[in-house]
A protein has these predicted regions:
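Acidic, low-complexity mobile loops and tails
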Residues: 1-55, 92, 96-134
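Short, glycine/small-residue-enriched coil/turn segments at secondary-structure junctions
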Residues: 2-4, 68, 72
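A short, compositionally biased micro-patch
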Residues: 18, 61-62, 71, 106
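Short, charged/polar surface micro-motifs in flexible loops or helix N-caps
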Residues: 32-33, 46, 73-76, 81-83
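Aromatic- and Lys/Arg-enriched surface recognition patch
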Residues: 77-101
Length: 134
């Protein structure tokens, strides 16, 4: 599984890429592989305020519907509208064009609670399954 070194990870299989006080969020390669073919994404509303661990949107695949959780507290500033017409971007490019939303970070200290790439690799290597969130 692809686990980029420049990201941080939630135990529920979301990734977070920091850009100053903002962050981009999507689901991991492991999560998309467990879901199989993504057919629909319910995007979060721009302006929505969320807390870390709060369910923010839903990704549906031919296999299951999965809640997606915000890995950090803040305000949604953008949603990836390209997923409305091409939800398979989550499968083909989960860390690039398949991003789901952007968030203005409210509580920077929450970043410390996320997993490093190495910790996330341990989680998916030892779990034998998708765990929570998938």
């Amino acid at each position: 599984m692809n686990v980029p070194e420049n990201l941080q990870y939630a135990p529920t299989h979301e990734w977070l890429r920091l850009d100053g006080a903002d962050a981009t969020v999507g689901i991991t390669d492991h999560a998309q592989a467990e879901l199989t073919d993504v057919v629909y994404v319910e995007l979060p509303k721009i302006g929505a305020q969320v807390t870390a661990g709060q369910q923010i949107c839903v990704v549906e695949s031919v296999k299951a519907a999965s809640d997606i959780y915000s890995p950090i507290s803040g305000t949604v500033t953008a949603a990836n509208d390209a997923l409305s017409s091409n939800p398979a971007l989550i499968n083909t490019d989960p860390y690039g064009d398949g991003w789901i939303f952007k968030i203005k970070i409210e509580a920077g200290e929450e970043i410390e609670e996320l997993k490093s790439p190495g910790q996330y690799r341990e989680q998916i290597g030892g779990s034998g399954g998708a765990g929570e969130g998938v």
